[in-house]
Amino acid sequence: VSTSAPNDRAFFGHPAGLGWLAFCELWERFSYYGMQALLVLYLTNYLFLPQNIGHVAGIDAVRGAIEGVTGPRSPQQLASVVFGLYAGFVYLTPLFGGLLADRVLGRTKTVVTGAVLMATGHFLMAFEASFFFALLCLLIGVGCFKGNIAAQVGDLYAPGDKRRASAFQIFMLAVQVAVILAPIVCGTLGEKVAWHWGFGAAGVGMVIGLFVYLKGRRHLPPEPRRDRAAEKAAAVPRTPMTGTEKGRLVLLVALIPVLMMTVVGNQQYNNAFPLWSQKYMDLVLFGWQVPVTWLQAIDAAASTAAMVGSIAFWRWWATRRREPDEITKMALGSLIAAAAPALLVIASGIVDHSSEKVGFGWAIGYAVLNDIGFANVMPVGLALYSRTSPHKLEGLMMGTYYLHLFLANTFVGWLAGFLETMPGQQFWGLHAVLVGGAGVVLLAVKLVFGKLLAPTAVDNGQAAAPGSGDAVPAH
């Protein structure tokens, strides 16, 4: 419960703490997305090349473990698997960070610990030998930081304070600014100057974020002490789940592999797509070679526009026709997203027949189609799981929902290995089939289980709002 005064409106009508938290999050996300934009390119084009890979401490053990599952990997294939594992575990570690904050350290100490670990990890990326230790620091740091700083935003507001929703919109706007700027700044330094300059810029961003957080701590509400005896005495006896709740629970868990497939094209944007673009796309603009990492800035801008446009579209639609339910929106989103890799099937055909690189517009087309689809899958799915999960398991089920991103990233890391051995038309065609097939499965789920998922009076909150949901960065 917040201890902030209701009349605290120092930051655009919100508590001053929101400004500090949003600015801190901007720099943390700048460091994260700046490093992510460079990672697969750095591994493929430099660190995992035969003349350099021997410098990496622990590479024999890591490579042996990966190749024990996948078979021998080329530098690009190994880079894609490592990137996929890193990007996947980013969605698991916040579960443990939340437990650490709730039961041991408290949110503030956990956030500071996470920021220090991430800054350390970014600077360790400057040394080839410490690469895997750097990734470990980053993963643990993200786990400590990510969920807990968002929880502190909620702590600024008393229950029922109507400013809470717009507070998270402001918070997410800071994230979107970082997602756009990070690939431009860190990517340009990494590709045009030296890889370590890009990683160093990400580290500087994290240090700034830590300084901002420490400076703004006095504006955050104090954390209440937990009275375990009182909590135990006040505990309400658990009631058994109803048949509807059990059915929904089974269905929501069973949907995770389907949701994994819906975002395969989206998650590939940071893995195989920059590698494909580097080889087959003409990135010269007005005589200047545009860094490949800038494609991610284009995608971030398209993602922001798609999220806002989707919300506006469904609000407009609801004034004229009956609005579709969440599953239908997600199915439509998947089918739209499938058009993005399908577009690259055409581009790959042009490359194969003309032996010339394709233009910049194909990257923009991929980003726009993918992000329109993603805007109707990811946040809408979040709303579906929030509404239909059994109330006493809502927190667990929200964590379970993010499991599909862990699975998608690890799967995409393996799938990206086929980029070297499979013709481009087949490679991107496979992605289009996987994403489109998931959309068809979601339509089937709607037909068979529509009544089970339909809104009821006992749902958690209301049915999904138009275009629902929180702004979620595309990658």
PLM segments and residue spans:
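Intracellular loop-helix junctions on the cytosolic face of multi-pass helical membrane proteins
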Residues: 1-17, 159-160, 186-287, 309-310, ...
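Hydrophobic core of transmembrane alpha-helices in multi-pass small-molecule transporters
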Residues: 26, 121, 130-145, 354-376
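Central cavity-lining transmembrane alpha-helices of secondary-active solute carriers
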Residues: 80-99, 297-310
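Glycine-rich segments within core transmembrane alpha-helices of 12-TM secondary carriers
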Residues: 90, 163-191, 198-209, 299-303, ...
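Conserved MFS/SLC helix-loop-helix module at the cytosolic interface between two early adjacent transmembrane helices
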Residues: 93-123
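C-terminal ends and interior cores of transmembrane alpha-helices
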Residues: 116-133, 334-355
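Intracellular juxtamembrane helix-capping segments at the cytosolic ends
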Residues: 144-158, 376-389
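Transmembrane alpha-helices of Major Facilitator/SLC transporters
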Residues: 288-319, 332-341
